[in-house]
Amino acid sequence: FTGAGVSAESGIPTFRDALTGLWAHYDPERLATEAGFRADPALVWRWYADRRAAIGAAQPNPAHRAIAACESRSGSRVTVVTQNIDGLHARAGSRGVLELHGSILRARCLEGCGDPAHVAPGYDWRSDPRVPPPCPRCGAPLRPDVVWFGELLPPDVFARAERAALRCDLMLVVGTSALVHPAAGLPLLAREAGARIVVVNPEPTPIDDLAAGVLRGEAGVLIPAVLDGLPHRVAERGGAAGSEP
């Protein structure tokens, strides 16, 4: 279960840290609410275009790669759930990542007429000079396929994340402040179902007291060390994640 701290190590600023330069004087909620988008869609679209450019220049770091390698060796016994919208887990090789807050690399119709993941097959909305580009199906503006303030998490994605939390034996909570709900409730759900929690974060978090282990430091350093050998313990236990972090 990963958060913004993992992406920060790839040079991607958090939402509020990105409010610098030309964007420093804007109210964050003006740039990340449906009301703000409807009031000034061109402004919000340009903001997300700037963020997409920064993300495109970033690369997965050792934490992303170690998680993908663990998943590759362990198969369906590992589920990657993230609060990040940058797609770096997928670029590192993780498959079926549960993106709780959506993806900045996708767009969807503001009025909800199409499939968010495939809003317009064959249509390269990133190259459309119109700001924002229109939905080719109904003509309404396209919006970033991310969760804005005041919006619900994608119900199907969150339901799958809850099921994974309830079934897991071990949850690594990496690079998240564990303050943004409802996503932050997943470690508690896993703990109540009997899982062991290991927190990897530079700073204290509200769930440290629930954890079987807390590792202070950067994910890019600690996660490769933590996951080295974990797939072998998983295999030795016949498919159950090992009880030792």
Q: What residue ranges belong to the model's regions?
A:
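Conserved catalytic core of sirtuin-type NAD+-dependent deacylases
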Residues: 1-245
